[in-house]
């Protein structure tokens, strides 16, 4: 099978077509301009520097451009980085398209939509069900296309809905174990907790933060959406208030972006399973490219830790 970007080890030479996910201009200590690039294919992404750039390079090697390059995989502060030796823009004659370089969820969109719909169907609280169903219908196209984040976890096409499906399965297991859990509230919280990402983020290709994402953030966005849809549906009362609390508190702490800590059991569960699913996704991503008996590269989103891949099964 043809090797992809993250299949290469430190010290190996790479010659590949890659998609530019981000491109940021900087100035080196010698005063010369350079570009910090994030390059990707279906296996994942790596950072690279393009030195001594000209004005034309900023256009030729901008976001969403496909490039053919040759370079070396290096270790930079515990993480792989690509040192570029040669680079050029892809041409129509190369016969490559952006979709070839974008990682996608391991479950197709139709299957995920069917599974999420089943969880909504099982909800017995009419108000929570109506709010959840209405918001998902309003944003369903983007919900099933968008990543769950710009970097770190589930940062691929349909990553948002895959994250939700994984969390719903965890939520069901927790509710089966603890019968005092309000399944309807927990399921609604899981389905809606990151819905604001469809406004916070620009989309599945070369994802960046929108103006709303930078200034408001997905937590405040989804709480506002719940308020609006509840008013449209003439729903008020405690369910709306508690659902908004569950969504507001799902990051767990103020320093992590939540204005309130979890103060109902479903909010605490949502926070814990969100953290679990995101953490395991990040770990799986690096351990997939780590040989048994070795440590992974450092994972910034997990306190910059390296993880060990055991030799036994």
From Swiss-Prot:
Enzyme class, UniProt record, top EC level: hydrolase
Stretches assigned to the HD domain: 163-279
Keyword Nuclease among record annotations: yes
DNA-binding region positions on the chain: 22-90
UniProt name for this protein: 3'-5' exoribonuclease YhaM
GO MF annotations in UniProt: 3'-5'-RNA exonuclease activity; DNA binding
EC numbers: 3.1.-.-
InterPro entries to which the protein is assigned, alphabetical: 3'-5'_exoribonuclease_YhaM (IPR020873), HD/PDEase_dom (IPR003607), HD_domain (IPR006674), NA-bd_OB-fold (IPR012340), YhaM_exoribonuc/phosphodiest (IPR050798)
Native species: Listeria innocua serovar 6a (strain ATCC BAA-680 / CLIP 11262)
């Amino acid at each position: 099978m043809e090797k992809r970007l993250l299949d290469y080890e430190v010290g190996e030479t790479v010659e590949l077509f890659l998609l530019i996910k981000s491109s940021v201009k900087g100035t080196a200590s010698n005063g010369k301009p350079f570009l910090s690039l994030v390059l990707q294919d279906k296996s994942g992404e790596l950072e690279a520097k393009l030195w001594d750039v000209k004005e034309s390079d900023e256009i030729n090697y901008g976001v969403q451009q496909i490039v053919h390059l040759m370079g070396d995989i290096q270790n930079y502060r515990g993480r792989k980085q690509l040192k570029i030796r040669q680079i050029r823009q892809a041409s129509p004659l190369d016969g490559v398209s952006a979709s070839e370089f974008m990682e996608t969820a391991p479950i197709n969109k139709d299957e995920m939509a069917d599974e999420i719909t089943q969880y909504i169907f099982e909800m017995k609280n009419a108000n929570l069900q109506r709010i959840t169903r209405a918001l998902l219908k309003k944003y369903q196209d983007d919900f099933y296309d968008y990543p769950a984040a710009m970097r770190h976890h589930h940062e691929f096409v349909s990553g948002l809905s895959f994250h939700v499906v994984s969390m719903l399965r965890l939520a069901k297991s927790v509710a089966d174990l603890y019968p005092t859990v309000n399944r309807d509230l927990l399921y609604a919280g899981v389905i809606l907790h990151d819905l604001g990402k469809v406004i916070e983020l620009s989309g599945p290709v070369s994802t960046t933060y929108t103006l709303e994402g930078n200034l408001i953030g997905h937590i405040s966005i989804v709480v506002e959406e719940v308020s609006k849809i509840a008013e449209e549906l003439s729903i008020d009362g405690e369910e709306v208030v508690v659902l908004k609390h569950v969504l507001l508190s799902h990051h767990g702490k103020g320093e992590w972006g939540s204005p309130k800590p979890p103060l109902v059991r479903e909010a605490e569960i949502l926070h814990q399973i969100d953290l679990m699913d995101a953490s395991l996704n990040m770990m799986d991503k690096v351990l997939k490219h780590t040989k048994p008996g070795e440590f992974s590269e450092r994972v910034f989103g997990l306190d910059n830790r390296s993880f060990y891949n055991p030799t036994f099964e």
